[in-house]
Structures are given as structure tokens and as C-alpha cells.
């Protein structure tokens, strides 16, 4: 929203700048060229000639609305299944599942993995989609200060006691690359705690997929702990735009 002297004049409303021109690091705003710091097109693939060519060919072959409908009705295709297999192989996991978009994906994953008996331990700077997903969770949850591994261990001790009482499991949630600060989650240290605690690890790697690790395989690959991460959440919206 507006800052400085303009904040008082905004009456609480956000502004919506109108950018013009091709998506890129430099675009036109109010008749002059400006640097665009707001794009998610990390690798510039949205402008790549091969990507544009494939996009045009797919639109000509299948139309602009295909596949139309939810996957459980009329929206499932062999291309979905092929892409899921290729993505799973790329990041080193046995399987993958495509969802419509990132925010909904994380909320759905959390809701799918947890029951009211389960306990969650999560980083205080987890993305808003994680927080919204946790709001649907009716069980206990414990937060630890950002990247504070001593505090994370303490919360795992609390979570273990609660899980023993409820008969549930423990899910730890963190990010590979934190979107607000740009620092890395301490995945190697969290995975190491599995020697002392019984939990599953869900990593939101929206910003790390395509940019971190061997060949862009993500932050878990960067730390060499892919096998220790139980569920990887990635998105096409950042590096694959």
C-alpha cells in the first residue's frame, strides 16, 4: 500500500499500479521505464522462445480452455499423469500430484495430511498459505521463532507429549527459501532431529524449486536431505513462470 506522506491520503486502500509492455525486469509505468522488483519469473522462462512456441502449439491443438473441469470429472489427461511422473523423478520422490495453484495447494495438503489427533510444529515466518491451512486444523499446534532450532527442539518435546496423549502424529512445517527474508530454512538441522523425534517434515519450497540445489531440484537437494523430507511443496509460479 501507499507509504510515507501518502499513507494518510489512502484511506486504507491499496494502490494498483498499471505496468505496460512485455513481462520483464524493466517495464513501462506512467510513460517511463522502471525496474520491476515484483515479478516471480525468476529464470525468465515466461519469455523464452521455446516456451512461447510450446504454448502457442498447445493452444492451437487443444484450445484455450482445455482441460475443462475438475480432474475427478472431465479435467484429467495423460499429460497430467506424465508431468507428475517427470516431476517426481526430477526432485527424487516416488510420486507427485498436481494442484491448481500454490495457495490452494498448501491449504489442501495440510488439511489432507492432518487429523484432529495430530500435532503441528511450524516456523513463525511460515507463508500465509501455511497459516491459513493451519487454521483449518482442529488439533494442537506449536510455533517456534524463525529458524531457532533450539526452540524447535523444545516444541518437538511438547508435541511428542501431546501426540502420546492423543494417539496422533507430528508434522513439522517450514520453508526451503523464506519468501519474506530470502534466507534458507535449516532443513539439514531439522532432518537431523528425526534421530531424536518421530515426525514427518513438510517443506514449502515455492522459492527454492528451480533455483536451488542440483539442476534446480530445490532446497532439500541443496542441503542433501531430500530423503529426509517427507513432503515437498513446489510451484510453477516462481521459477517456472
Please tell me what each predicted stretch does:
Residues 116, 136-138, 197, 228:
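Short, structured coil segments at secondary-structure junctions
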Residues 2-65, 199, 231:
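N-terminal "arm"/small-domain region of PLP-dependent enzymes with the aminotransferase-like
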Residues 221-241:
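Active-site PLP attachment segment
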